[in-house]
Structure formats: C-alpha cells, structure tokens
Amino acid sequence: MSFEVKTTPHFEREAKILAKRYKSFKADMKDFVESLEKNPMQGDELSPGIRKIRLAIVSKGKGKSGGARVITYTICASESEGRVYLVDV
C-alpha cells in the first residue's frame, strides 16, 4: 500500500505542545506515521473514513491506554493508494 500522510494546521499546533512536554513524542510520531503508511485502516472507525488510533508516548510511561489518541481521515484513491490526514491528537 502506498499512502501519503499529511497533517492539518490544528494537528500541528497540538503536536507541538505535546512535543514540548514529552521528549519521545517526535520519535513516537515518526514510528506512528511509518506504521500508518503501511496500514492506514488501523484503529477504531468512528464514521466512514474517520478513525481513532491510540498512540503510546514512551516518555509518559503509561503505554497506549495513557498515551494520545490520534484522529485520522483517510481518502482512498484505490485499495493500494491514497492520503491519510492527521486531524487531531
């Protein structure tokens, strides 16, 4: 699958705040984006195309349940390609 991951301005603001608070957040997000490019259909579907995915923040030390929730919006051009927008965290 070849999915491109893009961010919204709102997501960038929220991610910047979390990156200042948790040192591992940038590395965690990089791993998350790589995972999302391979499998954009992970997480719980809230409505068609919109998904909620749990993200563990390593420096927070509480696993996925105490980590962040990332809201994504997926647009599929075909089954093997499309775009994933990171909407909120």
What are these regions (language model features)?
Residues M1-K64, S78-S80:
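Basic, Lys/Arg-enriched alpha-helical interface segments
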Residues G61-K62, A68, Y73-V89:
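Enriched for short, Lys/Arg-rich terminal
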